[in-house]
């Protein structure tokens, strides 16, 4: 029986490249001249620091633009609240990976409500979908892409 997995992953190499490009752009921008501002990647978290709250917003927009250029979906960004220490502002941006159980249940419910002839099962941080026909699986992929679930999904491990 044909099957595929629904996962939510980001390419860490592309994430690192986007952070490096964002730092490079900060060094050349006129409005960030003589300002202490930087991006730092620690595992799946980008630590953003600047001298003002307004600059943090600009830096998030810079990062979002470079993520789009590198092919990383910005919907996986989860910006935490900004904190002020002294004259500097800091903010952590966490990149979500894996499908949490409530989101997996939403996906399974979405598939069942679409009345497609497929079965969906939650397996850890991914959802496996099996069906008798490849066309049913492709309709399932189209239905999930059409739904706005607030998280980017990839479809891999397609077996026939």
Curated annotation (Swiss-Prot):
Family classification: Belongs to the YajQ family.
Key word Membrane present: no
Function recorded in the entry: Nucleotide-binding protein.
Entry-linked Pfam families: DUF520 (PF04461)
Designated name of the protein: Nucleotide-binding protein VV1_2655
Assigned keywords, A-Z: Nucleotide-binding
GO MF annotation terms: nucleotide binding
Organism: Vibrio vulnificus (strain CMCP6)
